[in-house]
Design a protein with these regions (language model features):
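Helix-to-loop junction immediately C-terminal to a conserved catalytic motif
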Residues: 7-8
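ABC ATPase "signature
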Residues: 176-177
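Catalytic Walker B motif of ABC-type/P-loop ATPase nucleotide-binding domains
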Residues: 119-122
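ABC ATPase nucleotide-binding domain helical subdomain, centered on the C-loop/LSGGQ "ABC signature"
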Residues: 17-19, 27, 34, 52-93, ...
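Conserved catalytic segment of ABC-fold P-loop ATPases
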Residues: 161-167
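Conserved catalytic loops of ABC-family nucleotide-binding domains
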Residues: 142-153, 159
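A short, proline-enriched helix->beta-strand linker immediately N-terminal to the Walker B motif
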Residues: 113-117, 146
């Protein structure tokens, strides 16, 4: 978790460099860097407003159709459709009227609306069941293949299909490779 916060420069590295696209993140314009990197945290934030309002925090100009498409990718559309007011359903401050897994899926959809070049998922599917997690990962592979995805997870199943898996233990690299390796 601390390591990935160096990518959008929430913190700067005390030594060494962090590179995105081969460029030191300190050489990027901070606004540009943060526009191109989306983070979804395990503990996420929803605001008072409709589901659409909350999704549009990712892109204020997103059409309803774009919001629905990203909600489908994040497996949020299936529960949104069960609400009487669908995408116009009111969300309480902090998302107190939706479950933890629903909050996570809404914040994933919101991050996808930004169309980031780098998507950081920090234990962001920990509150969803493994079947839904698998659907989300499949949608990522099929629908946003050009986006770099950095996934921090406790469940092996959440990262087993990753191109590279980095195992850290007390801040040290303990393993690097594919799941099969």
């Amino acid at each position: 978790s601390s390591l990935v916060q160096l990518i959008p420069r929430l913190y700067d590295a005390e030594s060494g460099t962090v590179r995105v696209g081969g460029v030191d993140v300190r050489d990027y314009n901070l606004d540009v860097l943060r526009r191109e990197v989306s983070m979804v945290l395990q503990k996420n934030v929803l605001f008072s407003g409709t589901i659409l309002d909350n999704l549009r925090w990712g892109d204020a100009n997103a059409t309803e159709e774009e919001c629905i498409r990203m909600a489908k990718l994040a497996c949020a559309d299936e529960f949104i459709q069960r609400f009487p007011d669908k995408y116009n359903t009111w969300i309480e401050q902090g998302g107190s009227n939706v479950s933890g897994g629903q909050k996570q899926r809404l914040t994933i959809a919101r991050a996808l609306l930004r169309k980031p070049k780098v998507l950081i998922l920090d234990d962001s599917t920990s509150a969803v069941d493994t079947a839904t997690d698998a659907k989300i990962r499949k949608a990522f592979r099929e629908e946003i293949p050009g986006t770099t995805k950095i996934i921090i997870a406790q469940r092996i199943s959440s990262v087993q299909d990753a191109d590279r898996i980095l195992v850290l233990d007390n801040g040290q690299i303990n393993g690097l490779g594919t799941h099969a390796e």
